[in-house]
UniProtKB/Swiss-Prot annotation:
Region Disordered: start-end pairs: 1-31, 55-83
Family annotation (PANTHER family): TRANSMEMBRANE PROTEIN 91, UPF0338 PROTEIN
Record's subcellular location: Membrane
Official protein name in the record: Transmembrane protein 91
Organism: Homo sapiens (Human)
Main location: membrane
Gene: TMEM91
Species lineage: Eukaryota, Metazoa, Chordata, Craniata, Vertebrata
Length: 172
């Protein structure tokens, strides 16, 4: 099995460079003469790669950007979104666990509304409506906390009523 030598493999890469390597002129070494790797890198400098840049969280943080034109047709108008061009790459919390807990264990009518808004958060994020997702997330959290508060009040009222009933009964 014949394997090509290293020089034969490098030859197509070094054809366009005008660099003389130290192996070609062993006695002569000029200050600043580039090595083969540097010459290859310099030959690629003029080429432009057509692939788009990969998205990154930190890409372009210091570079000014024109403001993004967002769809302002969201039905959630009470959002406190500031309209900045740098959007958070993180999904707003949907508070689904709180909504399920408040629906099953606390005050179910408000818990159902919190559950619906928690689902709306994920749908708005999937559509790219970050403003609507944030507003739905805040509403789901507030309704979940309200349902837990109303549930605690309901349970406390039930315990007080039960204690009053048992205290008013005559012992057997």
């Amino acid at each position: 099995m014949d394997s090509p030598s290293l020089r034969e493999l490098q030859q197509p890469l070094l054809e366009g460079t005008e660099c003389e390597t130290p192996a070609q002129k062993p006695g002569r070494h000029e200050l600043g003469s580039p090595l083969r790797e540097i010459a290859f890198a310099e030959s690629l400098r003029g080429l432009q790669f057509l692939s788009p840049p990969l998205p990154s969280v930190s890409a372009g943080l210091g570079e000014p950007r024109p403001p993004d034109v967002e769809d302002m047709s969201s039905s959630d108008s009470d959002s406190d979104w500031d309209g900045g061009s740098r959007l958070s790459p993180f999904l707003p919390h949907d508070h689904l666990g709180l909504a399920v807990f408040s629906m099953l264990c606390c005050f179910w009518p408000v818990g159902i509304a919190a559950f619906c808004l928690a689902q709306k958060t994920n749908k708005a994020w999937a559509k790219g409506d970050i403003q609507g997702a944030g507003a739905a997330s805040r509403r789901a959290f507030l309704l979940g906390v309200l349902a837990v508060g109303l549930g605690v009040c309901t349970y406390a009222a039930a315990l007080v009523t039960l204690a009053a009933y048992l205290a008013s009964r005559d012992p057997p």
